[in-house]
């Protein structure tokens, strides 16, 4: 089937779904048709824009063949042809991108987890910097950033921290942030002015709803214990801390941030559900090895993806060879869009090349 035939088939399907919805269908049939209709809407808009430009180009070329035009009119026609010829490849690419298989998780909210890696206290301080950077980015996007848990070192660093980020298409924007982030800078405690290298690991998980992942009570082991603060001292006289283990997968989440055991359990279940959903999602992707070849980076938490070099004021993304000399804007102000949009574009380009 040719590209044009495929587009015509999609338009026919969209029109037929519209007629079906107008015919008064009810129940599950209506829900299914409404979902399909909504999913096709974006690509149909792009197909119509592409077809319109294609038709206008054909008309302009035919018009040009007519006799009797003065030079000024002919120049105007040729300008229009030139504009349309330049726009067609862009419009065609937009259609193809809209036709790419969608990641079901892209529209979801996300849970972000940041953990200090190699580098001791400096790594923990960097983990806190990254966590705050994502909080500012969420604020810029108008998303809701809810801190789930923070394990701090007592002097400003985070051993680990997690947050729920709610909003439209959050996961599609943040999913490429998973991996190892490396920092090169002179620690405040360094008297010799030597540059230290340390790292933190970021994991971005699509936030799963109960309809996505059904967790049976019989599959959970829930342990409670007293919360402890920095240095291990007990800060609570009640067993408010919660550790939940999902027995079939072995995934464990421990939380002690809230004074209420009930609140800790609710937050832990939210993180657990996201981790199980992400594991299932990754297993499915692994089965589709051919499509996985087209992804930007593996999304593996052990993959080094970005370096933040403070002395040089640069941030470098190693997957797309993009370096920006604006470290304060990125780290302090959360201006990540230049990296994120470039990563999305590169991912789309790789997938398009495999069509």
UniProtKB/Swiss-Prot annotation:
Native source organism of the sequence: Rickettsia akari (strain Hartford)
Chief location category: cytoplasm
Subcellular location, record wording: Cytoplasm
Purpose of the protein: Peptide chain release factor 1 directs the termination of translation in response to the peptide chain termination codons UAG and UAA.
One Gene Ontology CC term in the entry: cytoplasm
Name recorded for this polypeptide: Peptide chain release factor 1
Gene: prfA
InterPro entries: PCRF, Pep_chain_release_fac_I, Pep_chain_release_fac_I_sf, Prokaryotic/Mito_RF, RF-1
UniProt xrefs under Pfam families: PCRF, RF-1
Gene Ontology molecular function: any one: translation release factor activity, codon specific
N5-methylglutamine PTM positions: 233
HAMAP family: Rel_fac_1 (MF_00093)
Annotated segments matching region Disordered: 281-308
Domain of life: Bacteria
Family: Belongs to the prokaryotic/mitochondrial release factor family.
Chain intervals with Basic and acidic residues compositional bias: 281-293
PTM annotation: Methylated by PrmC. Methylation increases the termination efficiency of RF1.
Keyword annotations of the record: Cytoplasm, Methylation, Protein biosynthesis
Gene3D superfamilies, sorted: 3.30.160.20, 3.30.70.1660, 6.10.140.1950
